From Swiss-Prot:
Highest taxon, organism lineage: Bacteria
Family of this protein: Belongs to the TACO1 family.
Compartment list: Cytoplasm
Primary localization class, coarse: cytoplasm
Pfam families to which the protein is assigned, alphabetical: TACO1_YebC_N, Transcrip_reg
Protein's UniProt keywords contain Transcription regulation: yes
Identification of the protein by name: Probable transcriptional regulatory protein MSMEG_2940/MSMEI_2866
Length: 251
């Protein structure tokens, strides 16, 4: 029986991982479709589309899926949805601020799913503007270190508008104004430095430190929100201390 139980558990875990992978693929595909619709279907002349395609490739999205999404967005192939960007605001456990970015073809469904995830996981919705002011929209480029120093990266991107370079351990994070994002990633390319992703992102201006139990609750809420097909990104102003992060890694 124990062998069967272990097999069943393994099978369940694989199903969960496969489901998460499928949802991630769908979100990356949506980004490609929208980028092509907004800026045109040529990645060479549309940096947002180029980055969306590269991100999908690095996440092992099949090339056929990528190309079909590009064509749908560019109007070269039928079937493109009318995607709308909507941002919802709320508070999670411990008073942590939460921003939820949705890309949906059904506003009512998206709002309902976000509300349910919030209320079932210790959160609540907030009025527009009551949470957003705690965050700033920034350009964020991430890259593996691969032997590079912080000075190497700074030298490449400083004149392109980079505001800061953060050392994340195995990787670097470059922060800029969203309007300088293309210039920063272009500067990296010209310096022969490969990067993992280049996205506009919300960065918290004020953070809320949490203990282990608080971190668990907020992460559970984030998981529930990200489980919605309409949700593209979830941002919080939670600050997880190093000792708490180490405990979470062990779980």
């Amino acid at each position: 029986m124990s062998g069967h139980s272990k097999w069943a558990t393994t099978k369940h875990k694989k199903a969960v991982i496969d489901a998460k992978r499928g949802k991630m693929f769908a979100k990356l595909i949506k980004n490609i479709e929208v980028a092509a619709r907004v800026g045109g279907g040529d990645p060479g002349g549309n940096p947002t589309l180029y980055d969306a395609i590269q991100k999908a490739k690095k996440s092992s999205v099949p090339n056929d899926n990528i190309e079909r999404a590009r064509k749908r967005g560019a109007g070269e192939e039928a079937g493109g949805a009318d995607w709308q960007n909507i941002t919802y605001e709320g508070y999670g456990p411990n008073g942590v601020a939460v921003l939820v970015e949705c890309l949906t073809d059904n506003r009512n469904r998206a709002a309902g799913e976000v509300r349910v995830a919030m209320t079932r996981n210790g959160g609540n919705m907030a009025d527009p503007g009551s949470v957003a002011y705690l965050f700033s929209r920034k350009g964020v480029v991430t890259l593996e270190k691969n032997g590079l120093t912080e000075d190497d990266v700074l030298l490449a991107v400083l004149e392109a508008g980079a505001e800061e370079v953060n050392d994340l351990g195995d990787s670097f994070e470059i922060i800029s104004e969203p309007s300088d994002l293309v210039a920063v990633r272009t500067a990296l390319q010209e310096a022969g430095i490969d990067y993992d992703s280049a996205d506009a992102s919300f960065q918290p201006s004020v953070t809320v430190p949490v203990d282990l139990e608080g971190a668990r609750k907020v992460l559970k809420l984030v998981d529930a929100l990200e489980d919605s097909d309409d949700v593209q990104d979830v941002y919080t102003n939670m600050d997880i201390p190093d000792d708490v992060a180490a405990q979470l890694d062990e779980e």
